[in-house]
Amino acid sequence: TIFNKKIDIKKLFRYSVILLLIVFIGKSSYSNYFYIDYIISFIIIYFLLYKNNYKKTFTVIYLILLTTYSVIANKEDKLVKSSVIKDNNEIKELVKDIDTIDRIAFLKNYSINVNNIFGNINLYQNYVYSSTSSSLYNKFVFDVFDREMQHRNRLILSPVKNIMFLMFMNNRYLVGENINIHGYKEINKIGNTSLYENTDILPFMYVSSNTYNINNYNKLSFPYNDEVLLNNVITNNGDNKHYNTKIKEVFLRRSDIKYIDTNIKIENNVIYSMKRNSKLIIDVPSDAKGKILFVSFNLSNGQSCSIGDMAISINGNINKKTCNEWKYYNGNDSFTYVISDKDLNSVTVEFLKGEYHIDNLRLYYISYDDIKDINKNITKVNIDKIDGDNIYTSVNNIEDGYFVTSLPYDKGYTVLVDGKKVETEIVNKYALGFKLDKGNHNIKISYKSPFKNIGIILSIVGIVLFVFNNYNLFKKK
């Protein structure tokens, strides 16, 4: 079209100006690249239209630019490192003989493929990066359990060293190097990679008679909400009982800060980090030493993408708030941490470059001994068989209670107890559950996509219409 001079340059210019205004208003961090591309493209179009002598020259230049861009863009692609392949092989060897149906968290390499189960069908993960994952589960993780938000958007759910979350979500196994988390013991090691196990965690499915009313639960704040979740089933019809917490609050003094990086400046509640990974080292208050430490505060300001994201890491547990112009702004204004290291005496706090307005700083602690017996007050469910979208289980519970799963609730689930369909409901703010009378029961949990049949019918109709339309076009020819 350009070579034949059939392009309307005035119309193209008008539309381009409108597009430029939209880009300018949008204030994307990539706007400058668009402006450069726009200017170069218009120069090339002008010479191709009005300077015939330069047609071949600019065609060559255009091809060179495209080739150069392609090479630079593809240069960013990286092959899988041999060390990653070695890690994966070590992990496969470590987990191949595990015969329990439990969850596993890979803490060795956060970039590991979260959907890879390494050949062991008994192991599951509750970490995913997907726009199609359960919105109910996503909301539970970040808004109910107040788990650390480690990434630039909420769609990424990656492993954490949060002992409360690990125990609640049935993470019996961890894989990594030098893991020092309460409750986990090394049971095998290959090379530099170790397999750790914690038998104190809640099972994949269980029955509990300890219930807590959802309205009362919604009034709780971090970290008390996590403690109640570990010890109760949250339901609409739960008990209105008073919960006796084991969590205690402690206070941080300025004298507890033992080291301040030269790139950090502190003024009242504002911390200025002049350089990436600037750090503080803070002594843990004496009452909280060796305990599970909870930290929470509000980050009341934001900053431009010209500076970058805001992030604070405490002993490797990171919370991130995206810069203001980022298209997937995560809105993380409340930073919470669960520091689960054994022998905890001090914490290292690291900052990305930026200005941090920190308000309402609170510290709490709890002993691991106060939560390690959570699975003593429930009845574990036997998972007899998994066949496609069907889970067959059995349980003998000594009193009436709730059958609790760690499966995100969905309308597609059907539950049969001793062959009879029962009503399901949302428990623990996200999971599939239902009431279960005391006694010995055989239970089948089935899943069928709610709109699967409609989707199949519409697909068939679409194929028929496509064939019919092409047949008519063929006849006309």
Regions found by a protein language model. Give the residues of each.
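Extracytoplasmic/lumenal acceptor-recognition loop(s) of multi-pass membrane glycoenzymes
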Residues: 62-81, 94-165, 201-228, 233, ...
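Short, polar loop motifs at secondary-structure junctions
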Residues: 110, 175-181, 408-411
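Contiguous transmembrane helix-bundle modules in multi-pass membrane proteins
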Residues: 1-87, 309-314, 321-324, 345, ...
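C-terminal, active-site-flanking charged/polar segments
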Residues: 1, 43-46, 64-67, 185-217, ...
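Active-site-proximal, structured, solvent-exposed surfaces of multi-pass membrane proteins
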Residues: 253-477
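Loop/turn elements at helix/coil->beta-strand transitions in domains of secreted/extracellular proteins
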Residues: 7-9, 99-103, 169-172
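Periplasmic/luminal catalytic loop of GT-C fold multi-pass membrane glycosyltransferases
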Residues: 148-191, 199
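Catalytic cores of secreted or luminal carbohydrate-active enzymes
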Residues: 165-170, 191-261, 356-372
